[in-house]
From Swiss-Prot:
The gene is E1. Residues 159-170 have a biased composition (Basic and acidic residues). One of its GO terms (cellular component) is host cell nucleus. There is a cross-link at K555 (Glycyl lysine isopeptide (Lys-Gly) (interchain with G-Cter in SUMO)). This is Replication protein E1. One of its GO terms (biological process) is DNA replication. The modification Phosphoserine is found at S92.
């Protein structure tokens, strides 16, 4: 079918566009319509009145668009003016009632979002959130403006002519309102933004680093609990008034022994960095309340932590800033700053001497590893070698080696001493002021002749065969264990227990003992002695089995035994009668009305007893010790230098 010439459609519409069918010369064998002239020229005169411009629809659309935009701009200006006026009288906390859809301040209409259809929507309440110069957000209720949308032209000319001007005018209105209602550079706004931040501590740490050029954590160590007490504290206080900051430097002195105060002006006000040593220990809560009262700053604007006491970098910072003109320092410099900054202290702390630690443990009679570790660590403030010990990564090894060496030295020292020297050595460790009479009175109270007891004690201390064991028996609560244990405590004797008799090593403590004791021997225990330990009771050499060591041949030390039965009178153990020296305690131990012992038996009284009966017990000095009255046994020393102390 041949193509028809002309246009399709009626050509109506507001856009002014129409379609023109091109006239194409005949190139095929198709038949041409008879009512058309193939040779006629198309001049377009028949289309001159095709579009009617009298309605002027485009001009009307542009005029309506301008009126709508003007109305929107005026409504926005009025709303902004109302918010600026009401912000002074509206609660900054806002209303908690539910609202409609929130409209952002940057949400503006453009020509591209406008359609020709006009539709009215139900008026709803909207909330405009306006920043309030750091004092919180103001929420102002207003009626939502009737939505009017206008369709855009397909060529986008309206957007180019009017859309840009609308956005520029709206943005200019917003900037003017912001400049009037909020100054982001003001100190008040900055400190309020700090308080409103989600992570206040991170914000304060960031501002501190920007101000001082170093991290706050480089100067402090962290206390997880707010109740932990400490005398030294580092405080960073934000937003302090300049006048209060100057007066604070004087007011704080009466609460502290040492203060180091730095104050710098920032956008948030004065930022104070302070190192303070209080007169007594305080926790974080107490320190915060005190500083808040003096500076009129909330505790949430403070960073409070104790200083690093072992960091040379932190100590050097306080030392260098303390001698500069940016700090106000009062009081004596803390010892931990002096220790970490003085050159000599630094040299001494860097070298650890194990022999010094061993000498300290030997002099103070520490042989347990836990006691050595704890007590030596307590000396770190006044002993450079102890401070170096704490800095070492081999503390456990040093403690173990120190305890081992101290035990070796103690064991060798004890073996080289005779019984007279050992008693003299133990007397030198006790204080004066004892009385020997309570011991004698207690023996008489139990019906024991003092002279017979002295004779038995003399043979007992010498380790005479068949006289090497003393047995004290009697009813319960007669003071047997109290009397014997006090003597063991004074002479540092060793206590063995029959409960461990199933082990081959239960007698191993006898290897290092000058004196031994077995408390509360029963019939089973006496049977064991009768079967296996007759030579030990005689005071002859015995063989001891030691754990992880070879058998040791040694003379059994003097043995003191308490019991509720008399082994001499029992027919089951006839062979023990000649090996035991027996004393009976028949009377109950006396107490006064306050439940205190009537006869006081302690180290002081035993010292006085041995000094009084020294000659009676035949505790004479050795010939190689000299003719003087004092026993000059030189104190052991394992470090260089002179030691003038005597034993």
């Amino acid at each position: 079918m041949a193509n028809r010439e002309g246009t399709d459609g009626d050509g109506s519409g507001c856009n002014g566009w129409f379609l023109v069918q091109a006239i194409v010369d005949k190139q095929t064998g198709d038949t041409v319509s008879e009512d058309e002239d193939e040779n006629a020229t198309d001049t377009g005169s028949d289309l001159a009145d095709f579009i009617d411009d009298s309605t002027d629809i485009c001009v009307q659309a542009e005029r309506e668009t301008a009126q709508v935009l003007l109305h929107m701009q005026e409504a926005q200006r009025d709303a902004q003016a109302v918010r600026a006026l009401k912000r002074k009288y509206t609660d900054s906390s806002g209303d908690t009632r539910p609202y409609g859809k929130k409209v952002g301040r940057n949400t503006r209409g453009t020509l591209q979002e406008i359609s020709l259809n006009v539709s009215s929507t139900q008026a709803t309440q909207t909330v405009y959130s306006v920043p309030d110069s750091g004092y919180g957000n103001m929420e102002v209720e207003t009626a939502e403006v009737e939505e009017v949308t206008v369709a855009t032209n397909t060529n986008g000319d309206a957007e180019g002519e009017h859309g840009g001007s609308v956005r520029e005018e709206c943005s200019s209105v917003d900037s003017a309102i912001d400049s009037e209602n909020q100054d982001p550079k003001s100190p008040t706004a900055q400190i309020k933004l700090l308080l409103q931040s989600n992570n206040k501590k991170a914000a304060m740490l960031t501002q501190f680093k920007e101000t001082y050029g170093l991290s706050f954590t480089d100067l402090v160590r962290t206390f997880k609990s707010d109740k932990t007490t400490c005398t030294d504290w580092v405080a960073a206080i934000f937003g302090v008034h300049p006048t209060i900051a100057e007066g604070f430097k004087t007011l704080i002195n009466k609460y502290a022994l040492y203060t180091h105060i730095q104050s710098l002006d920032t956008k948030q006000g004065v930022l104070i960095l302070m190192l303070i040593r209080y007169t007594c220990g305080k926790n974080r809560v107490t320190v915060g309340k005190g500083l808040s009262t003096l500076l009129h700053v909330p505790e949430s604007c403070m960073l409070l932590e104790p200083p690093k006491l072992r960091s040379p970098v932190a100590a050097l910072y306080w030392y260098r800033t303390g001698i500069s003109n940016i700090s106000v320092v009062t009081g004596d410099t803390p010892e931990w700053i002096q220790r970490l900054t003085v050159i000599q202290h630094g040299i001494d702390d860097s070298v650890f001497d194990l022999s010094d630690m061993v000498q300290w443990a030997f002099d103070n009679e520490y042989t347990d590893e836990s006691d050595i570790a704890f007590n030596y660590a307590m000396l770190a403030d006044c002993n450079s070698n102890a401070a170096a010990f704490l800095k070492s990564n081999c503390q456990a090894k040093y403690v173990k080696d120190c305890a081992t060496m101290c035990k070796h030295y103690k064991r060798a020292q004890k073996r080289q001493m005779s019984m007279s020297q050992w008693i003299k050595f133990r007397c030198s460790k006790c204080d004066e002021g004892g009385d020997w009479r309570p011991i004698v009175q207690f023996l008489r109270y139990q019906g024991i002749e003092f002279i017979s007891f002295l004779c038995a004690l003399k043979e007992f201390l010498k380790g005479t065969p068949k006289k090497n064991c003393i047995v004290i028996y009697g009813p319960a609560n007669t003071g047997k264990s109290h009397f014997c244990m006090s003597l063991m405590h004074f002479l540092q004797g060793t206590v063995i227990s029959y409960v461990n008799s199933t082990s081959h090593f239960w007698l191993e403590p006898l290897a290092d003992a000058k004196l031994a004791m077995l408390d509360d021997a029963t019939g089973t225990c006496w049977s064991y002695f009768d079967n296996y330990m007759r030579n030990a009771l005689d005071g002859y050499a015995i063989s001891l089995d030691r754990k992880y060591k070879s058998l040791l041949q040694m003379k059994c030390p003097p043995l003191l035994i308490t019991s509720n039965t008399n082994p001499v009178e029992d027919d089951r153990w006839p062979y023990l009668r000649s090996r035991l020296t027996v004393f009976k305690f028949p009377n109950a131990f006396p107490f006064d009305q306050n439940r205190n012992p009537v006869y006081t038996i302690n180290d002081k009284n035993w010292k006085c007893f041995f000094e009084k009966t020294w000659c009676r017990l035949d505790l004479q000095q050795d010939e190689d010790e000299g003719d003087n009255d004092e026993n000059t046994f030189t104190t052991f020393k394992c470090v260089t230098g002179q030691n003038t102390r005597i034993l």
